[in-house]
Amino acid sequence: MAEAKTNGQTELVFLMDVSEPMADFASDIIAGFNGMIARLREERTDILVTTWQFADFCLYVDERVPITADSVHMEQDFFERLRIMREQVARQAAPAPITLEDGKPGRRVLINAIGGVVCRARYVYKHYPETPARTMFVIITGGADNASLYYWTPDRLRDLVERQEKEAGWEFILLGANIDAAQVV
């Protein structure tokens, strides 16, 4: 297999828990994220930022955006706007069968989110001619997974993360609120 070309850049991949309980930490999360981005902007401009958010679903916000772009920040009212959006969607949603898990605040698909985002990054790097010289995943969560139902299990995810650390040199950082990191994954 040919050695991948690097572009000398660093890619920061943020995976942020936006489940309802995280709203209790909103000001700390927003200030911490924006502060870190501001410090990194002063130090270097060769950083790409990818931001994903998850609760009971996972979606990307920005993908491979230069750190100098104005879109790389969190608005102060982010969690409040998210709460309002959830309420609007809940009112408009068609009735569905109710299960014991429905309606419980704080549902997190942490394992599915991490596994999916790591696989997405692998796919992107495979199809881009140049990959970042350094890739760092920053996972911000307030609790352990309690909603992943699909492909990923803790053991499969651990194997994937360890393989990427060993083979590709990727780094993974878990920033948690009120959790024991060993119990998360």
What are these regions (language model features)?
Residues 1-184:
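Acidic, low-complexity intrinsically disordered regions
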